[in-house]
Amino acid sequence: MRLTGNDPVSSLLPAVFDWIRADSERPVLGTCAGAILLAEPGDGGDPLVDTKIERNGFGTQADSFQSNIEAEALGRDFPGVFIRAPRFTSSGDKAQVTAKLDNEVVGVMTNNRMALSFHPELSGDSGFHEWLLRTAEKLEADSK
């Protein structure tokens, strides 16, 4: 992640961050390492979500696990897959909790930028990806 995106000869992450920052309502879904990038872009700019995060906060690869989480953004439980997952250590006033594991925050959102410490793409449940598509479709329809 850091080797390609922040390499002086690569323009990948700066272009992505510019695209995200260009529209605060643009829906973005960052999972695991993507959540880290949203919280700590590392490009000298402000965080893209109003939260602090600890890399590998849930432990090593051997500590990886699966557990049902309360997905407040979806209004239902969701099968969370945690692989060397980051841990949210604090959230600011602009952050909305989108998911919890027991009482611990595992998902936050600022505007339409959602950061998740787990891997929804490995769960077999498309709920968070459907949220992303619905939000993008609604913004597109509202702009016409």
Which residues does each PLM region occupy?
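Hydrophobic/aromatic beta-strand patches that form the interior of the parallel beta-sheet core
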Residues: 29, 81, 114-116
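Generic hydrophobic alpha-helical membrane-span motif
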Residues: 38-40, 65, 125
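Pocket-forming structural segment of enzyme catalytic cores
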Residues: 42-104
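Flexible gly/pro-rich beta->alpha loop and the following alpha-helix that scaffold active-site loops
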Residues: 1-30, 35-41
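A secondary-structure boundary/capping signal
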Residues: 31-33, 49, 84, 118
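C-terminal and late-domain segments of enzyme folds
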Residues: 77, 87-144
